[in-house]
Design a protein with these regions (language model features):
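RNA-contacting regions in translation and RNA-metabolism proteins
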Residues: 1-43, 53-75
């Protein structure tokens, strides 16, 4: 999941070198924290959060084969 989020985020931003993805696996869920440069926040979130929602939807679909819930947090 980490690699998927990283590829998507790097394709959206102007500063791909600043993209950082941290994956934390717990009993009940997989937590993915996406950090981007402050200038790129708007590009990753999108108008009314549409791009952020799309990223979460793609990750959820990719994780549907597993038994854990995936939570994507953008910072």
């Amino acid at each position: 999941m980490k690699e998927l989020v990283e590829v998507i985020a790097k394709s959206l931003v102007d500063h791909p070198e600043a993209v950082e993805v941290i994956e934390t696996i717990k009993e009940d869920a997989i937590y993915i924290e996406l950090k981007v440069a402050q200038d790129d926040m708007g590009k990753v979130i999108g108008k009314q959060g549409k791009i952020a929602k799309s990223i979460r939807t793609v990750v959820k679909a990719a994780a549907s084969k597993g038994d854990k819930k995936v939570i994507v947090d953008i910072k």
